[in-house]
Curated annotation (Swiss-Prot):
Protein name stated in the entry: Cyclic AMP-dependent transcription factor ATF-3
Gene Ontology CC annotations of this record: centrosome; CHOP-ATF3 complex; chromatin; ciliary basal body; Golgi apparatus; intracellular membrane-bounded organelle; nuclear body; nucleolus
Quaternary structure note: Binds DNA as a homodimer or a heterodimer. Interacts with KAT5; promoting KAT5 autoacetylation and KAT5 deubiquitination by USP7.
Known outcome of mutating residue 168 to T: Found in a patient with childhood apraxia of speech; uncertain significance
Chain segments carrying region Basic motif: 88-110
SUPFAM superfamilies in alphabetical order: Leucine zipper domain (SSF57959)
Role according to the record: This protein binds the cAMP response element (CRE) (consensus: 5'-GTGACGT[AC][AG]-3'), a sequence present in many viral and cellular promoters. Represses transcription from promoters with ATF sites. It may repress transcription by stabilizing the binding of inhibitory cofactors at the promoter.
Biological classification of the source: Eukaryota, Metazoa, Chordata, Craniata, Vertebrata
Keyword DNA-binding belongs to the record: yes
Keywords for this protein: DNA-binding, Isopeptide bond, Nucleus, Phosphoprotein, Repressor, Transcription, Transcription regulation, Ubl conjugation
PANTHER family: CYCLIC AMP-DEPENDENT TRANSCRIPTION FACTOR ATF-3 (PTHR23351:SF23), FOS TRANSCRIPTION FACTOR-RELATED (PTHR23351)
bZIP domain residues: 86-149
Annotated positions of the Phosphothreonine modification: 162
Amino acid sequence: MMLQHPGQVSASEVSASAIVPCLSPPGSLVFEDFANLTPFVKEELRFAIQNKHLCHRMSSALESVTVSDRPLGVSITKAEVAPEEDERKKRRRERNKIAAAKCRNKKKEKTECLQKESEKLESVNAELKAQIEELKNEKQHLIYMLNLHRPTCIVRAQNGRTPEDERNLFIQQIKEGTLQS
């Protein structure tokens, strides 16, 4: 096979009649008709020669290479290496199994620990929410008791405050969130 540039045709595929424009009969061709084609023909011949040399070198190189049954430089046979190699692979597999089991156990313990901690925190959260509700109920009860006591309070009358003043003070204290006695 010849090396070709894209768009070029090999010399064997081209006939003389295809190279030269045939406007005249075959015997009437002159030298000038071939003069402008010589660079193309020379290039085609050069590629053909290079291709032959390349093919010849490749075939001689392939003939010189011999295939052997075992790699060069290896004096130990496969049977001698196999027991040592197999033993090493077995030990490594065993260590890997142990490490994998250890890793799985550690992961399982960590998951269980996190689950217990999550349950504990949820329990504490529920207790705190219950305590908040209890304190809110106690606050409402104390406000109710205070409102029941206000009309009969003796201390209020001694301080000189009017019921309207007491009511405004009480509303202000509720808004601030503190009840001062």
